[in-house]
C-alpha cells in the first residue's frame, strides 16, 4: 500500500494502552525549545514505525512517547516508516493481533499491569492513552543510570512491572516519584533484577551511585536539573486530552 511520508499525528493508532507522562513532559520541553527548522529536522530524524492493518489502520509499533509529545507540541504531522504491510492480507481481526503480538509489535498490558487485554480496547489515537506512573519511574531510573538502554522489546515496561510488584508508589502515583527513586535504584542493582533487560552489575553500578552522592535519593536537591525537575507541566492533563477534538 502506497503511503505519504508524513501522516497526521492523530491518524496513527497506538498498539499499547499506557505510557509514562513524565517522559512525555520531558520530551515536550525539549521540543518546545527548538526553532521550526530544528523541530522539522528532529521529526525527520525520528520516523514513527507503523504496521498497516488489513483494514488500512496505521498502527504504531514504537515511539508512543515521542508521538504523544509531538501532539502536545502542536506537531500536526509526523514522518512514518512502514515496517509491515498487511493491507492486502486476509487475516481475521484475531489472527492479525496474534501476529502483532508474535512480532512484538503490540504490548497489551494495561496501566495497572494487568493483561494481556483485548486489542478491542486499545485507544483509537494517542489522546486516549493512559498514564502509568511506574512507566515514568522506570524511565527516570534509567535516566539516572541504574540500568542500560537496550534493544529488548518493551524493556521499560518490564522494569515498570518489576517496580509495581514492590508497590513502591502505593496510592501516590506520579506525585510520589521523587520519594521512591532511591529505593528503585537500589532494587535495580539487586540480585532480584539480574534477569531484567539492561541490568548492570553491582560493581559497575556503584560508579553511578558514587557520582550521585550529592543527591538525596538520587534526585537533585535544588530541583533545577534532572528528569523530574526539568519536566514542564502540560497545558492539559490526560483526562482532558481524551476528550479534546
How would you name each of these model-derived features?
Residues 64-66:
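Active-site-adjacent structural elements in enzyme catalytic domains
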Residues 1-57, 71-245:
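Surface-exposed, charge/polar-rich loops and edge strands
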Residues 59-62:
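Short hydrophobic beta-strand that contains or immediately precedes a catalytic carboxylate
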